[in-house]
């Protein structure tokens, strides 16, 4: 819990320092990942940080993923938090297409 609190504080400092206009993208590979990614939204809401959630699959909708990553900076995203189960390619694929920091979240496969 101490680590999470320090992370939360540092995360807010980074986001707020860059610009009040920036927001966070929370991207998941499928709706089944929403329960895990909801923890991210809780932290962001607690700090009053703007965010958008999106379901984009690196495997099922690669064109959509490519378009999202290529336009993320133009769309005022300062950080992307991406999570997916299985092979978890989503964070790496998005990261390869943008200069925006991407945080990968491992999600348990069922």
Question: Model segments located where?
Answer:
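Short hydrophobic targeting helices and cationic amphipathic motifs
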Residues: 4-7
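Glycine-rich phosphate/diphosphate-binding loop of Rossmann-like nucleotide-binding domains
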Residues: 22-60
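Short glycine/serine/threonine-rich phosphate/pyrophosphate-binding segments
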Residues: 33-38, 62-65, 84-93
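N-terminal beta-loop-helix "entrance" segment that forms/cooperates
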Residues: 53-73
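Short, structured active-site "lid" loops
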Residues: 68-88
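Short, acidic/small-residue loops that bind anionic groups at enzyme active sites
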Residues: 97-110
């Amino acid at each position: 819990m101490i680590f999470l609190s320090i992370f939360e504080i540092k995360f807010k400092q980074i986001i707020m320092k860059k610009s009040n206009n920036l927001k966070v993208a929370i991207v998941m590979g499928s709706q089944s990942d929403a329960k895990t990614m909801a923890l991210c939204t809780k932290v962001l809401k607690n700090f009053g940080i703007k965010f958008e959630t999106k379901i984009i699959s690196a495997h099922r909708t690669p064109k959509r993923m490519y378009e999202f990553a290529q336009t993320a900076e133009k769309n005022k995203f300062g950080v992307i938090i991406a999570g997916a189960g299985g092979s978890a390619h989503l964070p790496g694929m998005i990261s390869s297409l943008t200069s925006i920091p991407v945080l990968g979240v491992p999600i348990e496969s069922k």
